[in-house]
A protein has these predicted regions:
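Extracellular/virion structural assembly segments
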Residues: 1-147
């Protein structure tokens, strides 16, 4: 999925002048869990030649990791560093002790219904030359699917 913005608890990332971006941590591909791992419980029959399904359960919820930074279309190069007050506002908004409504958005999605998730974030700083230029968001949901 390609996304540039998201809504979380009724507010948009773009309201803060930020976009979803990617910092080049390595040249390898990124692998993300779909959060839908199912455990199948089976009973062996016919001396192990056949198994019958007795139960299934989801073992993990949806998780994702992505970066955010200031929108370069709104800020000059020398203004791309995240200031303390901007960092504080983003942390208050994103780093909560509860799951809140979330949806990822691209430019076309703002006017149509999409899939929602109940999520919260753990946040890490992305520093370049000891200056804060971005945040890495580790999204965790309360379900293995959206609604």
């Amino acid at each position: 999925m390609y996304a540039t913005d998201f809504e979380y608890d009724g507010q948009y990332l773009s309201d803060y002048g930020f976009i979803i971006c990617h910092f080049d941590y390595s040249s390898g591909a990124n692998v993300a869990t779909a959060g839908s791992k199912i455990t199948f419980e089976k009973v062996s029959r016919n001396k192990g030649k056949q198994h019958s399904l007795t139960n299934t359960r989801y073992d993990e919820c949806v998780t994702a990791t992505f970066d955010i930074c200031k929108n370069p279309e709104l800020y000059e190069t020398e203004e791309m560093m995240i200031e303390n007050d901007e960092y504080r506002d983003l942390m208050r908004w994103l780093n909560r002790r509860e799951f809140l409504k979330f949806q990822a958005l691209d430019e076309d999605d703002k006017l149509r219904d999409t899939c929602y998730f109940n999520v919260s974030f753990n946040v890490e700083k992305v520093k370049i030359a000891e200056k804060l230029y971005g945040l890495r968001l580790n999204l965790e949901s309360d379900k293995p699917f959206g609604y």
